[in-house]
Amino acid sequence: DFEGYHFRIVDLPGTYSLSAYTPEEIYVRRHIIDETPDVIINVVDSSNLERNLYLTTQLIDMNVRMVVALNIYDELEASGNTLDYHLLSKLFGVPMLPTVSKKNRGLDTLFHVVINLYEGVDFFDKQGNMNPEVLKDLTEWHDSLEDRKNHEEEHLEDYVREHKRTGRVFRHIHINHGPDLEKAIEAVKEEVSKNEFIRHKYSTRFLSIKLLENDPDIESFVRTLPNAEEILRIRDKMAKRVQDTMNEDC
């Protein structure tokens, strides 16, 4: 329990992607789709971002509500490396917070942001700026923490003050795969989107990307749709076009 909210947390198996290559990947993906969690806390290893952020891009394509916990942040600091997580948050368009779970560092902030996401707080406006009311709330909430016992001031100070100065972060952003792939994704997505009943549960962009990757699990699902034959025809056509243009498959 935190700030009057009761959290039901499901710890899913660790995975670096949402492909269909391992049982863990399939299980995690199906859980997200079938159980539709209110908010996803995407815990990444701060010292191995390149490997971890691929999963983040896939979660973005799934259109889930998400906050990224940059965990084991103390080890990154101890190594002498630095991370501009303010910029990283802007580039991905999702809140990213440094945490050290073993020391309870940053966890209060993390769950406060989770509550805001759950309540449907609009973190970003149409221009990609962070909502000033959200900034005000985070700043005031952080200031109230300074009087709490054993509060680690640095765990939010830098994050909130930085945003207070700049007042800008980018909105939830899908990774652009380049003109050829994006054209293929859009073509498949247009046909998939004709099935309005699936929109509340599936991201049509995510389904389209996975179809172009020949994901067997997603293809099996798509074959149950009324226009499955046309979807797969367009997928095959666009996949061939990408292969001919880029000399590699999707």
Predicted regions and their residues:
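Alpha-helical transmembrane helix bundles of large polytopic membrane transport and channel proteins
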Residues: 67, 77-250
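Flexible beta-alpha connector loops of hexameric P-loop NTPases
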Residues: 13-22, 73
